[in-house]
């Protein structure tokens, strides 16, 4: 899923910008003493950031990757790509998404969009050049699985919940620091502002661990969908090809590399922020499906 990290970054940026704006406008002072009102206030802005990210996800993905949408196929490869996505979409019971190709040497693909009937599926030029037709079909089926499963909407809801609690507890922490350490009893001072922003950054990272855990679980489900649509053997072969290419340098920005079918490698604590399970685990899970 070549969308998660940009989605998270957008959410965090919205939270911080909202915090600064609300502080400058003086809105925070009306919610600081009433925790019920504060929670509602945080929920409104927490879900706003999540929904903004969801609704502009296609535009962000196109701009960030340089994806060229195929409207009129110019080659037999583009024609095959459109026909394959149309067939897989029909089998999955969704409206055909937009189809695109983005210029990247590494083998990758992504699907995004605010609902299953208004989505985008794109593959890298490198994947088209090096993968067999059956393997490309399996990768497309995996991405169609994400769309059919409604993963982006579910992710937006989860992100909205964690955004809410990040904003809420950051402000509780900010009030404590402002009063207990800075001894400010007259509204919100500079201590509140600094502590709130700091807490949002820290809690935002911790909240990302929850979202990444969800993302890893959904990868297994997308693999299962890919196996149903394209065949278990083809899905395993595609993942094995990705595993063989793990040493290929990634040309895309770091904020986007975790958005695709190939999520890269991380070890130790960094593994908690992986959007994808290890390829070995995904292959083994497919083998258990038979």
Curated annotation (Swiss-Prot):
One of its GO terms (cellular component) is plasma membrane. Zn(2+) binds at residues 142, 146, 219. Its EC number is 3.4.24.-. Keywords: Cell inner membrane, Cell membrane, Hydrolase, Membrane, Metal-binding, Metalloprotease, Protease, Transmembrane, Transmembrane helix, Zinc. It comes from the Bacteria. InterPro entries: HtpX_protease, Pept_M48_protease_HtpX, Peptidase_M48. It is found in: Cell inner membrane. One of its GO terms (biological process) is proteolysis. Binds 1 zinc ion per subunit. Pfam families: Peptidase_M48. The chain crosses the membrane at residues 4-24, 36-56, 150-170, 193-213. The active site is at residue 143. It is a multi-pass membrane protein. Its cofactor is Zn(2+). GO terms for molecular function: metalloendopeptidase activity; zinc ion binding. Belongs to the peptidase M48B family. NCBIfam families: PRK05457.1. This is Protease HtpX. It comes from Ectopseudomonas mendocina (strain ymp).
């Amino acid at each position: 899923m070549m969308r998660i990290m940009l989605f998270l970054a957008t959410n965090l940026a919205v939270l911080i910008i909202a915090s600064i704006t609300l502080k400058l406008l003086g809105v925070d002072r009306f919610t600081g003493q009433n925790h019920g009102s504060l929670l509602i206030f945080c929920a409104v802005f927490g879900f706003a950031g999540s929904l903004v990210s969801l609704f502009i996800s296609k535009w962000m993905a196109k701009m960030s990757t340089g994806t060229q949408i195929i409207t009129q196929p110019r080659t037999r490869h583009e024609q095959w790509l459109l026909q394959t996505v149309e067939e897989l979409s029909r089998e999955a019971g969704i409206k055909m998404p937009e189809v695109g190709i983005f210029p990247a040497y590494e083998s990758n693909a992504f699907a995004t969009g605010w609902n299953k009937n208004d989505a985008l599926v794109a593959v890298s030029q490198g994947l088209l050049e090096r993968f067999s037709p059956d393997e490309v079909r399996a990768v497309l089926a995996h991405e169609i699985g994400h769309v059919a499963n409604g993963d982006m909407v579910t992710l937006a809801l989860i992100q909205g919940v964690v955004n809410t609690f990040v904003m809420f507890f950051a402000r509780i922490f900010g009030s404590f620091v402002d009063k207990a350490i800075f001894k400010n009893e007259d509204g919100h001072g500079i201590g509140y502002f600094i502590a709130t922003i700091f807490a949002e950054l820290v809690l935002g990272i911790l909240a990302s661990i929850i979202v990444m855990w969800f993302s890893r679980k959904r990868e297994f489900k997308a693999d299962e969908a890919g196996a149903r649509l394209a065949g278990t053997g083809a899905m395993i072969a595609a993942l094995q090809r990705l595993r063989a290419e793990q040493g290929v340098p990634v040309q895309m920005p770091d904020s986007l590399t975790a958005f695709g079918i190939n999520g890269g490698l991380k070890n130790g604590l960094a593994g908690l922020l992986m959007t994808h399970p290890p390829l070995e685990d995904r292959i083994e899970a497919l083998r258990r499906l038979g």
